[in-house]
């Protein structure tokens, strides 16, 4: 069609030019000059339109006439129409398609193991739970350059009757992690050892903590559990690449047998959201929701601790915890602040219906004289609280993409006071192991970690720390 229009236009112009040429010689000169300059303008316009830029596609010889005509001024006004409109819409669609493809390609590149680019809100590690282990691990891994997101059900200060006595092994681990500042300003109490009261023989045995290489006592420390947790959380929150979310994790997300992230319900908005990462650390504590889906071992509850706080109670020996060998179960006593002392009474079997009566009638008569009066006052005025004394041996977690740690993974009797020591040493171990893996998407590198027989290692360390 364009060729036909070009020929018709050329014939029309030729005839008109013939009429003009028949007028006079002068007119012939003027018209000749006009045609020369007009042709030159067409050529320059054509070269400008199709000759710009290196590597641009040149028009074919078959389309030369149509392209030459289209270069004429106002040609687009005569020959544009629905086709141009459709072409514009198609161009917009192609442009959007290109942007969409480019975005998809960038996402694919960022998510590839070798070229992953993380940001503050694109975590490498998600930690479920912000207790001792979760908070401490978030702080130290963030200092190693990891982007960490912590999801905690309730970020208010917790109120518990256990997790208050940090043994020397745990205190050393806390210092090694650079977190010793978390026990400062808590009105904490230094502990240098134990005094064992044998009520049957009416004797006392002192058991001091071991000495260090400088012949100084390796002390422990006791405090309000909630204050310590808030100190650890503040240390983690101070790191710029740690993000805290207040919400409840409902599911571990899996793909091809590997944990790839979590689904959680945000507390403030009640919205259900998903978050993905290469490594999820489950540290949701004693009553773990996800333990049974990751390990086969079950929790064994041997007894219950009943706790209360005595005010201004004297100590048999300064800075020493006390253990009373009562009948039928022991009583643990340790100072947690400048004027408060925790009492934990171990009760085996079925819990008595009237706890206050049990404490007054069964426990009070067996206590040392210096404790009796403050104990009786505490039982009568303070709220008695209970906590199961649980045992859970460690076992391997045979699922990639997830770690199960803390009380969710391994527990021993609270009488040992070794729970937090084990937790902090586990943080030390995993900090050391993970620092050798710069990219946690490198599954092969991560899978090499179990080659150290991790279950046996944790069991050995747990027993060693408890014995310190």
Question: Where on the chain are the PLM-derived regions?
Answer:
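Glycine-rich FAD pyrophosphate-binding loop
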Residues: 126-130, 140-162
């Amino acid at each position: 069609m364009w060729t036909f229009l070009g020929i018709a236009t050329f014939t029309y112009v030729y005839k008109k030019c013939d009429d003009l040429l028949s007028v006079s010689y002068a007119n012939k000169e003027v018209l000749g000059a006009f045609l020369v300059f007009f042709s030159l303008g067409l050529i320059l316009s054509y070269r400008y339109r199709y000759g710009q830029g290196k590597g641009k596609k040149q028009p074919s010889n078959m389309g030369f006439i149509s392209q030459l005509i289209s270069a004429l001024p106002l040609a687009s006004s005569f020959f544009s129409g629905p086709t141009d409109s459709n072409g514009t819409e198609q161009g917009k669609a192609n442009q959007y398609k290109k942007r969409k493809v480019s975005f998809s390609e960038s996402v694919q590149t960022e998510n590839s193991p070798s070229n992953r680019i993380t940001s503050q809100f694109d975590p490498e590690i998600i930690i479920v739970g912000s207790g001792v282990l979760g908070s401490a691990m978030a702080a130290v891994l963030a200092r190693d350059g990891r982007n960490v997101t912590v999801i905690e059900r309730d970020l208010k200060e917790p109120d518990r009757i256990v997790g208050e006595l940090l043994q020397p092994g745990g205190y050393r681990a806390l210092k090694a992690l650079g977190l010793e500042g978390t026990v400062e300003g808590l009105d904490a109490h230094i502990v240098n050892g134990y005094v064992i009261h044998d009520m049957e023989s009416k004797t006392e045995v002192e058991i001091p903590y071991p000495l260090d290489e400088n012949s100084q006592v390796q002390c422990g420390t006791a405090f309000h559990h909630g204050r310590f947790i808030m100190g650890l959380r503040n240390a983690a929150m101070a790191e710029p690449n740690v993000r805290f979310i207040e919400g409840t994790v409902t599911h571990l997300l899996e793909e091809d047998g590997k944990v790839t992230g979590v689904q959680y319900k945000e507390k403030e908005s009640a919205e259900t959201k998903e978050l993905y990462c290469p490594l999820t650390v489950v540290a949701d504590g004693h009553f773990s929701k996800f333990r049974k889906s990751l390990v086969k071992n079950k929790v064994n509850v041997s007894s219950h601790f009943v706790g209360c706080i005595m005010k201004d109670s004297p100590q048999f020996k300064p800075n020493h915890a006390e253990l009373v060998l009562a009948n039928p179960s022991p009583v643990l006593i340790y100072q947690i602040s400048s004027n408060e002392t925790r009492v934990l009474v171990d009760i085996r079997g079925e819990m008595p219906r009237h706890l206050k009566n049990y404490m007054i009638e069964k426990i009070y008569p067996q206590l040392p004289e210096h404790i009796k009066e403050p104990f009786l006052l505490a039982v009568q005025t303070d709220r008695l609280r209970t906590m199961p004394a649980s045992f859970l041996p460690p076992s391997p977690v045979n699922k990639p993409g997830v770690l199960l740690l803390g009380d969710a993974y391994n527990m021993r009797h609270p009488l040992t006071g070794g729970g937090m020591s084990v937790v902090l040493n586990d943080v030390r171990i995993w900090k050391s192991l993970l620092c050798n893996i710069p990219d946690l998407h490198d599954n092969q590198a991560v899978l090499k970690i179990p080659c150290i027989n991790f279950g046996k290692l944790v069991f050995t360390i747990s027993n060693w720390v408890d014995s310190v």
